[in-house]
Structure formats: structure tokens, C-alpha cells
Design a protein with these regions (language model features):
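PLP-dependent aminotransferase class I/II
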Residues: 274-351, 356-360
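Conserved core of the PLP fold type I
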Residues: 109-245, 256-274, 432-439
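Residue-level recognition of strand-loop junctions within catalytic nucleotide-signaling folds
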Residues: 295-296, 326, 369-371, 412-414
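Hydrophobic residues in well-ordered beta-strands that form the structural core
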Residues: 170, 191, 249-251, 321, ...
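Short Gly/Ser/Thr- and Asp/Glu-enriched loop/turn motifs at secondary-structure junctions
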Residues: 51, 139-140, 359-365
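N-terminal basic, amphipathic alpha-helical segments
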Residues: 1-102, 108-112, 122-124, 303, ...
Length: 440
């Protein structure tokens, strides 16, 4: 596609065949064609639209392609199970009350830039919120704050990556934000094979020997999209390999809404591991409050990166989040969110229990392996026709990686129970009736 478009063989405005038609013509899987179309769109070579098709966009300007949005726009007439949105448990009223209390009682000025003194209460509250059981003993000075987990991950990558073509290692299926971050930083992204316990140490070592690598970016507690949890033994093996190969580790814990018993990698190798999370999935996405516990001796460097990038979080956000965390309101909200998510998971498992579903009661999405006859992209397209939006495995595959026949269903807690249950029932009906088509 790239060569044909750039040579002029395919002219601007030419409509490309539908995915399944082109797959049939070429004798390849629809998933492969769908990924090629998606990558071409990210490079600006083609333009796509629901119900419109895929058209040649002409010559792309390198570096200026507009990729798919990470935050999905919710359509009022559709049931959106693409993004794991924080359930409404009354936090809106709590946050409004905190804002009102701060407006009445705060003494410092909102005129100047935030500084180390005005940031300290939020850093201290975040350190206490994370706790020593998760990341080992830390002080507020070990905490660096960012605008949500995604931006905080990018900040950590900016701190540790160097050279003209840095290498990031990650899981073979990864949250799309990982691809966006790697592209933004002009880094090579290498996928590492996983099993039921997480990233395989033998495959990680093989990748390190073959490609090198400055950083391993992973989600050890809650992997998106598969719900996999990396065992403690496996985490210890990964930490040992990181020491052997002088590898930095960035653990993205943004999907964890509970208080896990096992330590994060930051506790196992504090000299080289970053722990990153946010309040997005457990309290509120609107606050855009992320935080990193940096490896020993690297917090000041990360703060310099943050200051160079965006000067720091707005002081009102710092004050609101510090109050939510220190007052106990954030913990009360988190516990309510955890209970609501468990209810949503129970409903999903009851509706889809006869299918191959991976789930955990504390994870706001399930991983559905499709029965024979369905592929991720075709099932997602069929769901879209029913006004149900889901994410196919193709959206989590790395550019050169393979995608299993599976989809991720985020458990949207902000629609009525009747609509939610109806959507799950419809999904189960569709799974039982795959399309009658040739399986390449």
C-alpha cells in the first residue's frame, strides 16, 4: 500500500476494497488487512470513516499523521465497551465539595507557577496513598507527578531513553498508548511473548540479546487487554534479568483499582524500576492526576523533564487531589469503585460464561477469545452494526506482531443496567452465529 500510494499507482481519492474482499483477493487473513489499513491511516496514507470506507489520502507528511484517538468519543446511541471508564459512585459531588471547601479556606495564591513547596502536600499525599507495601520505603521526594498515567509514562521514557534509535521492550499485546508513546519518542518497539504468568523471562532475555533495549515497559498487576497478572516469582525473574542487562523497568499500574498483596517491581529492584499509576480508573478521570515513584536517585532528573515539558500540574489540581487523598475521600471512592466493578464483572461472566472469557473481579474489562468462525476485526465490525463498540485484539497488537482471535470488552458502569445486560446478551447471541465464510 505504502509503495503503491507513494509511486502514484494508487491515486488520491481511490477507494480501497473492504477488508474481507481484499483479504480474499490476496489470500491472507482479514485481521492482517485490517492492521495494514490501520497502520496506513496512522501514517496518513489513507483516510477512513465508519460507513464511508477507506480512501487513499495521497502523500503523507512524515511525523504529521493523526492516529486514532486514545480517548474514545462516546456516541449517545451506541453502547461503548471500548474504554474502561470510571463508574459513577458519587465522586462528582465529593469533588465539587472539595473544590468549594478549598475556595473558602485556602490561603496561598493561585497567581504564580507551582513550586516545590506548593507541590509538596500532593506529593506527600500520593506517597501515603501508594504505601510502602507496594513499592518499598519511599519519601515524598521520590514521587514525580504528571498529567495522568499516559503522560507520566512518556515522562519516564523521556528520562531514561537515549541515542538515535532507542529500544523499548513491552508485552506482545499492549495498550495502544504504548505504540503512541514509542512513535512520539522515535523509539523501536519490540514485543515479548507472554504466557499465563506474564512476560516469559526466556523470551525477554532472547529479545535483550537480539535487540538490546534500554527499558522494559509492562503492566505486571493488570495487563490490558488479557487481564493477566504477573506472578511474584516471575517478577523476581524479570528483576534479575534487568540487573543482568542494566535494563530500566517502567511498570504501568493504571488499571489496578485494588490494594494488591504482592510488591511492585519498584520494591524488588528500587535502583532501576519505575512505578506509575493515576487516579483515573479508581477515583476520577477528569482530574488528570498521575504519579511516578522513580528509581533511587532519578526523581530529580524526572522532575527536570516534567518542568521542561509542561512546568508541572496546575496548582488547583494539586490542591484538590491532595485533599481527596489525605482526607480519606479518595480511598472511600476507590472502595465503592471496586465494589461496582465486581458487580459489572459478575454480570459479564453470567452473560458470557459459556464462552472462553478471561476475567478478574477487580479488573474493569474481560478478554473474550472468539469461537471458530469469528476474527477480532470481523466481530468488532459486526458489533458496530448493532451499535455496540468493542476493541478487537488487532488494536493491541504491535506493528509487526500477530493478533489472536479475541476482543476486549470494557465494563461500562455508566449506562443503565438494562442496556448493559441487553448488550451482553446480544454479544452472546452473535458469538453463537459466526459468519459463513471461508477461513483463510
Amino acid at each position: 500500500l505504502r509503495a503503491a500510494i507513494r509511486s502514484g499507482e494508487l491515486e488520491t481519492g481511490f477507494k480501497l476494497p473492504p477488508v474481507r474482499e481484499l483479504a480474499w483477493q490476496l489470500g491472507i487473513t482479514p485481521g492482517t488487512v485490517a492492521r495494514a489499513y490501520k497502520l496506513a491511516a496512522e501514517e496518513g496514507l489513507v483516510s477512513t470513516g465508519v460507513g464511508r470506507g477507506t480512501f487513499v489520502a495521497g502523500q503523507a507528511t512524515p511525523g504529521f499523521a493523526v492516529p486514532d484517538a486514545l480517548i474514545n468519543t462516546v456516541q449517545p446511541d451506541a453502547i461503548d465497551l471500548r474504554a474502561a471508564r470510571t463508574p459513577d459512585v458519587g465522586q462528582d459531588a465529593v469533588i465539587r465539595q472539595v473544590m468549594a471547601d478549598l475556595a473558602r479556606g485556602h490561603t496561598h495564591s493561585y497567581l504564580d507557577y507551582p513550586n516545590s513547596e506548593t507541590k509538596h502536600p500532593a506529593r506527600a499525599a500520593a506517597a501515603a496513598w501508594i504505601g510502602p507495601d507496594r513499592v518499598g520505603r519511599i519519601t515524598p521526594d521520590d514521587v514525580v507527578m504528571g498529567l495522568g498515567a499516559q503522560q507520566t509514562v512518556i515522562m519516564a521514557l523521556q528520562t531514561v531513553l537515549y541515542g538515535t534509535t532507542p529500544v523499548i521492550l513491552t508485552e506482545e499485546l499492549a495498550y495502544p498508548g504504548v505504540r503512541h508513546a514509542a512513535r512520539l519518542l522515535r523509539a523501536q518497539l519490540i514485543g515479548v511473548e507472554m504466557d499465563a504468568d506474564g512476560i516469559r523471562p526466556d523470551r525477554l532475555e532472547e529479545a535483550l540479546r537480539r535487540h538490546g533495549g534500554q527499558v522494559l515497559l509492562l503492566a505486571a498487576e493488570v495487563h490490558s487487554p488479557t487481564t493477566t497478572r504477573t506472578s511474584l516469582e516471575r517478577r523476581q525473574q524479570i528483576a534479575a534479568l534487568a540487573r543482568k542487562y542494566n535494563l530500566q523497568i517502567i511498570e504501568d499500574d493504571c488499571h489496578c483499582i485494588t490494594r494488591p498483596e504482592d510488591p511492585a517491581l519498584r520494591a524488588l529492584c528500587p535502583e532501576r524500576a519505575w512505578y506509575i499509576s493515576s487516579l483515573t480508573k479508581s477515583v476520577s478521570a477528569s482530574l488528570r492526576f498521575g504519579y511516578a515513584v522513580a528509581p533511587r536517585g532519578q526523581a530529580d532528573m524526572a522532575r527536570q523533564v516534567a518542568q521542561s515539558s509542561f512546568y508541572g500540574l496546575p496548582q488547583p489540581v494539586l490542591d484538590i487531589c491532595a485533599e481527596l487523598l489525605s482526607s480519606g475521600e479518595a480511598e472511600r471512592i476507590r472502595q465503592k469503585v471496586e465494589r461496582r466493578v465486581a458487580e459489572q464483572v459478575k454480570g459479564a461472566v453470567n452473560a458470557l460464561g459459556k464462552w472462553d472469557v478471561s476475567w478478574r473481579r477487580d479488573v474493569p474489562f474481560v478478554w473474550l477469545k472468539l469461537p471458530q468462525g469469528w476474527r477480532g476485526s470481523s466481530f468488532a465490525s459486526a458489533c458496530e452494526m448493532e451499535k455496540i463498540r468493542i476493541k478487537a485484539a488487532d488494536e493491541f497488537a504491535l506493528p509487526d506482531g500477530a493478533a489472536p482471535h479475541a476482543v476486549r470488552l470494557a465494563l461500562n458502569a455508566n449506562i443503565s443496567a438494562a442496556r448493559y445486560e441487553g448488550a451482553l446478551a446480544r454479544l452472546s447471541e452473535m458469538l453463537a452465529r459466526p459468519p459463513a465464510a471461508v477461513d483463510f
